[in-house]
Structure formats: structure tokens, C-alpha cells
Amino acid sequence: MSDQQTCVIDNGSGVVKAGFAGEDAPRAVFPSIVGRPKNVSALIGVDSASEYLGDEAQQKRGVLKIWNHTFYVELRVQPDEHPILLTEAPLSPKTNREKMTQIIFETFNLPALYVAIQAVLSLYSRGRTTGIVCDAGDGLTHTVPIYEGFSIPHAVSTIQLAGRDLTTFLAKLFTERGYNFTSSAELEIVRDIKEKLCFLALNYESALKQSHDSSQFEKNYELPHGKVITIGSERFRCPEYLFKPLEMNGRELDSIQDLTYKSIQECDVDVRRDLYQNIILSGGTTMYEGIGERLLKEIENRAPKSINVKVIASPDRRFAVWRGGSTLTSLSTFASMWITKEDYDENGASIVHRKCI
């Protein structure tokens, strides 16, 4: 299989990242949602496809349609000519893994497949095999402790608080200023504001006081139709939701720092020091300026004083999972890891549990 270029596909909760092994960044990055036009007359002059994949779509697309789009439209490859690495969320049910394996072999006739846990790939992208990955995407935030390349399932923690919740929360904060963003198109504008202007305050109370006393945090944002709006404390109040879900928006969830701390404490005492010293941020919702310093401060307040806590927030962490997959499949030692078509034909979909641990 050395002459066949490997495709690496990271199916995130909100965004698909796809490309080729050995490259530094994915070739294609697109939302994993689909919609059918509600009002066809409004789309006169637009390509009359019955389905649209991208930002304007409202429903999750079936995984089969996403893969079709990935192979034939985005990467422009014939899947039966390429080994494929797919990613999965931690604690994915066995039936899901088998179904994914079955669909991809039987529909696309792949020569070979490997399924890897997203957080493990994030760790590999930083050149590590032990650490705890805090992965915040669009739909979920996970903390996944990993020891010598294997995740520790009983210590994995998840909350349903991530990128889309922060977008909705920022829209709610804007209503207090008299700006109403409610339609899906308007929420896309809010998402853009969030990604471009929001940041984490190291000390929230201090930043809030400063924002009342001065205009130092205020920034202007030009809307598509030309109107300019001003935002101030919303810039740091929005992502504060990750650190104070109850106080900020009345949700009784673990904060991102409690989630991380609890996952570490669930692990054997002998590995905790290694985990505290290798806290890896991953995913688009960890891209806020200041988030690494803030998480470090919060974990240091909880960890034993004898431990030197370290949080790694690499600049490319939005694509950490994809890059880990690109790196892993490029290793010469990886060749024996693939589930080949022959393996699948001989053993069925359950082979995924033996080959992809």
C-alpha cells in the first residue's frame, strides 16, 4: 500500500477536516451539516442541487453523504484506491464502530481502514504518548486521559457545552445591548464575531470592573450590510461560560477546569503527575486567546502544590486531531496497523475492535 496516498478524515461534531497523510494541514475543511432549500424560488439562479452542504444548512447530514462529499467533491479521489484513516469520539459505542467499518468497506470498497480516537491523535500531534487532552469542538467538550498511547476509558469525561453553545450565549448577551441575532444566517455572524474578537480573561472579576470603568475592551465589528456594532465585555463574558457554566448561564454542568481535574483524579495515582504536566488543548473552541493561561491558573489552584502543571496550547490546535492522524499514518511502523479489505472479508466488522484499540 506504500504507493497509495492515505486519506485522513476527521469527522468533528461541527466541522469535517480531510486531507492526505504527510501533509501539514487538511485540504478541505467544511461544516458537517446539510439542508434542503425551504423556498426554492428564493434560489433562482443558484445551482439547482436538491441538497446543500455547508454553513447555510440546518440539519446534520448522514455520515454516508458526508463521506461521499468528502471523497468525490472535496478531495476528488476514488476511495477504492486509498487507505483511509477515520477518527471517532472517545467512548464510541461498539455498534457504532462496527457500523462505520461495515459502511465504509461495503459502500466504498476501501483497500484499508484504520479508526483512531480523536484525543489520542491530538496527543500524537504534540509528539507525546501520555497526557490529558481537553478537546472542545462544536457540540461537545471531552477530557481524555491517555497513558502510553491508550486512552483510560473510565476516566473520560464529557459535557454538552462547546462552540455552538457559546455562539448562542453570545447572541443572548447581544440582546442586552439591543442587538438581535436570531436567524441561522445571523447566528453565523455571531459565530464569526466570537471567533475573531472573544478572549479569556485571566481574572474575570477584574476584567469586568475594568470594562465598567473604561472602554479598553471595546471593538467595532462591521455587519455584512455595512452597519457597525460595538462590543465590549461580551468579548470575555462569552467564553467565560466554559469556566463558569452555572454562574454565566444557569447550567449545572462541570466547568472545563473541573472536568479536567476530575478526569485526572479518576486515574491511578502513579500517572497523575504525568497528566498534570501534559494538559493538551485541542479543537476549535480552545482557540480563544488566553485560554491556556486561564486553564493553567485554575488547575494549579486544584492540583497538589508539589506538581508543576503544564498546559500546552499550540497555535494549530484547531487541526490537532487531523495532524495527529497525518503524522501517525506516515510512520513506517504503521503499515501493520491497517484493517485490510481481506481482514474485513474474513472477520467482518468486529475486526475493528481487535485492530483499532
From Swiss-Prot:
Q: What class of enzyme is it?
A: hydrolase
Tell me what reaction this enzyme catalyses.
Answer: ATP + H2O = ADP + phosphate + H(+)
Which PROSITE patterns does this one have? ACTINS_1 (PS00406), ACTINS_2 (PS00432), ACTINS_ACT_LIKE (PS01132)
Q: What is its main location?
A: cytoplasm
The organism's superkingdom is given as: Eukaryota
| Annotated coiled-coil segments of the chain | none
Query: Which keywords does UniProt give here?
Result: ATP-binding, Cytoplasm, Cytoskeleton, Hydrolase, Nucleotide-binding
Instruction: Name the Pfam families on file.
Output: Actin
After translation, how is this protein modified? Met-1 may be removed after translation.
Q: What is its EC number?
A: 3.6.4.-
The UniProt GO MF terms for this protein read: ATP binding; hydrolase activity
* Cellular localization per UniProt: Cytoplasm, Cytoskeleton
Q: Which GO terms describe its cellular component?
A: cytoplasm; cytoskeleton
Spell out the family assignment given in the record's similarity comment.
Belongs to the actin family.
Record's function text: Actins are highly conserved proteins that are involved in various types of cell motility and are ubiquitously expressed in all eukaryotic cells.
The identity of this protein, by name, is Actin, macronuclear
What organism is the protein native to? Oxytricha fallax
